[in-house]
């Protein structure tokens, strides 16, 4: 039996207006149907996304995070800390959903 790819999904349950909670099943279902075994971690405090990413990134094939720019920063910083070249996905769910400045 072929082993499934593993994915870490880190999300901030309080980011923005906490609307991510109503979409969790749909998000996880998409990745499961895509062949991933999904490890789900809702952040509990500032810095939690960083620590969980450092802990689990060496064990997964993909990291996806959802939240605001702080959540994205923690996950990217965690990957950099352990020097893991794991693809990363981002589902914006912060109050402004604009992690990068624009010239518009």
Language-model features: locations:
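Small-residue-rich beta-alpha loop regions that form the catalytic core of phosphotransfer
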Residues: 2-104
């Amino acid at each position: 039996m072929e082993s499934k790819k593993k994915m870490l999904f880190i999300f901030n349950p309080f980011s923005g207006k906490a609307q991510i909670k109503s979409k969790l099943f749909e998000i996880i279902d998409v990745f499961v149907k895509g062949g991933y075994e999904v490890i789900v971690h809702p952040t509990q405090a500032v810095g939690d996304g960083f620590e969980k990413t450092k802990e689990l990134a060496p064990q997964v094939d993909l990291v996806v995070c959802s939240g605001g720019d702080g959540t994205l920063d923690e996950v990217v910083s965690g990957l950099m800390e352990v020097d893991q070249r794991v693809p990363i996905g981002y589902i914006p769910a912060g109050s402004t959903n604009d992690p990068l400045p624009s010239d518009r």
